C-alpha cells in the first residue's frame, strides 16, 4: 500500500458501487472531483445531481467536467445539500457523497455546518435505494473546528443497525486532524431474532 489518500480510499467505495445508468448525488460539489467521477461511472444513461452554495464551486465544476470530457448527464445546483430531496425521488439514488468542511482554495468562512449537514444526511438516507451507498469524508480542525466532526460521528453512530452499515476509518498515526472517511450502506438487514 503506497501513500493512500483518504479521497482515493473513499472513491474506491464509490467505484465499486456506481454502475452505468445509476442516479448519484454529489452533496458538496466543491471543485467537482467527485462530480466528475460520478458522471463517468454513471455514464450516458445515468444522472448526477451536484450541490453547492457557492457560485464559484459551480463554475469550477463546470470547467472540470468539460475539461475531463464527462458525459452531459449532470445538473449543477446552486442550493444547500439539505434541500436535495426536492430534486430526487425517494429510494432511487445509488450513491451520495459528502466532503464536509470548506471549498479548497475558496472562502474558509463558508463551510458546512453540523446542523445543515445532519439534515442533509437524513434527507439523503431517504433517497438511497436498497443497497445504496453514502460516503462522508469529514474534515476538521483549522478554520472549521471540531463541532461538525463530533456531531456527525455521533449522528451516524446512532443510525438503525437493521437498516444501515456504518464504517468509520481513520489514520492512526497522522498529525493535524486528518479527514475521517465514513461509508454508510443502506443494507436493510434482517437480523436473526436472537440478535434483535
Locate the predicted segments by residue.
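S-adenosyl-L-methionine
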Residues: 1-20, 62-88
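Conserved class I S-adenosyl-L-methionine
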Residues: 22-30
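Conserved SAM-binding loop of SAM-dependent methyltransferases across substrates and taxa
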Residues: 31-42
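Conserved SAM-binding motif I beta-strand of class I
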Residues: 47-52
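A short acidic, Gly/Pro-enriched loop at the edge of an enzyme's catalytic core
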Residues: 87-95
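Conserved beta-strand signature within the Rossmann-like core of class I S-adenosyl-L-methionine
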Residues: 131-138
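Conserved small/polar residues in nucleotide/adenosyl-binding loops
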Residues: 187-193
Amino acid at each position: 500500500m503506497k501513500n493512500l489518500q483518504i479521497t482515493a480510499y473513499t472513491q474506491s467505495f464509490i467505484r465499486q458501487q456506481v454502475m452505468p445508468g445509476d442516479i448519484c448525488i454529489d452533496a458538496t460539489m466543491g471543485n467537482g472531483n467527485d462530480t466528475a467521477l460520478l458522471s463517468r461511472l454513471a455514464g450516458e444513461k445515468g444522472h448526477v445531481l451536484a450541490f453547492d452554495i457557492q457560485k464559484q464551486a459551480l463554475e469550477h465544476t463546470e470547467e472540470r467536467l468539460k475539461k475531463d470530457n464527462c458525459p452531459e448527464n449532470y445538473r449543477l445546483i446552486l442550493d444547500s445539500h439539505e434541500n436535495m430531496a426536492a430534486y430526487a425521488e425517494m429510494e432511487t439514488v445509488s450513491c451520495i457523497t459528502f466532503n464536509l468542511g470548506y471549498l479548497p482554495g475558496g472562502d474558509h468562512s463558508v463551510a458546512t455546518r453540523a446542523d445543515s449537514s445532519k439534515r442533509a444526511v437524513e434527507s439523503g438516507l431517504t433517497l438511497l435505494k436498497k443497497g445504496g451507498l453514502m460516503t462522508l469524508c469529514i474534515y476538521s480542525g483549522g478554520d472549521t473546528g471540531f463541532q461538525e466532526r463530533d456531531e456527525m460521528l455521533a449522528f451516524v453512530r446512532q443510525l438503525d443497525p437493521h437498516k444501515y452499515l456504518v464504517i468509520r476509518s481513520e489514520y492512526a498515526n497522522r498529525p493535524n486532524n486528518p479527514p475521517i472517511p465514513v461509508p454508510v450502506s443502506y443494507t436493510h438487514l434482517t437480523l436473526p431474532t436472537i440478535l434483535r
